């Protein structure tokens, strides 16, 4: 099952991936940057190509989001997957994901004033231009190699969309567990074991 590592761009997702990679995929907790890709990115063109989706047809990619996630889940293991996508129906009809395709989510929040500075540098634009980008719905690349366009939304919409993915909804969904972290470092419970 998928555990989403979701965030608005430049909010620390790669840092959290590095922590999780050190804990779950590296020997003795020492980060090996080659293993950072143990946590993949969604949407990513390689996985869509693998399952026969025309990556040059945006509608085909969108229509296959949930199907691809269900195919990923056939691996029958817990997988962390990074995304900057907002959790909504794109164009009102293409869901990013659903409760059946996801075990849970970790949403990484960074003060948007700090995001502006970092994102402006990343985009090579002024902080004012970045602020304008962040308050509009937009799509962009995750910044990873071979990533498809991601429907990011505004900073507020991105944050609120993931905030609305409720613990109670998942808990009631077919008896599967949904794990919610209240405070960083204080877990209610965890399905993960260190390798």
Language model features by range: what are they?
Residues 1-169:
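PAPS-dependent sulfotransferase catalytic domain
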Residues 6, 165-195:
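Phosphate-binding beta-loop-alpha motif at adenosine-nucleotide cofactor sites
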């Amino acid at each position: 099952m998928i555990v989403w590592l979701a965030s608005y761009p430049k909010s620390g997702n790669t840092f959290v991936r590095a922590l999780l990679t050190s804990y779950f995929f590296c020997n003795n907790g020492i980060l090996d940057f080659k293993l950072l890709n143990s946590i993949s990115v969604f949407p990513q063109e390689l996985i869509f190509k693998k399952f026969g989706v025309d990556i040059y047809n945006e509608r085909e990619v969108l229509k296959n989001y949930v199907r691809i996630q269900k195919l990923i889940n056939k691996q029958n293991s817990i997988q962390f997957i990074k995304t900057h996508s907002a959790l909504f129906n794109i164009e009102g009809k293409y869901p990013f994901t659903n409760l059946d395709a996801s075990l849970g989510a970790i949403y990484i929040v960074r003060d948007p004033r700090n995001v502006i500075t970092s994102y402006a540098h990343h985009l090579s634009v002024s902080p004012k231009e970045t602020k304008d980008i962040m308050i509009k719905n937009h799509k962009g690349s995750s910044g990873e190699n071979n990533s498809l366009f991601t429907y990011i939304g505004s900073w507020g919409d991105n944050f609120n969309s993931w905030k609305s993915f409720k613990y109670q909804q998942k808990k009631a969904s077919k008896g599967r567990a949904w794990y919610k972290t209240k405070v960083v470092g204080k877990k209610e419970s965890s399905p993960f074991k260190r390798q």
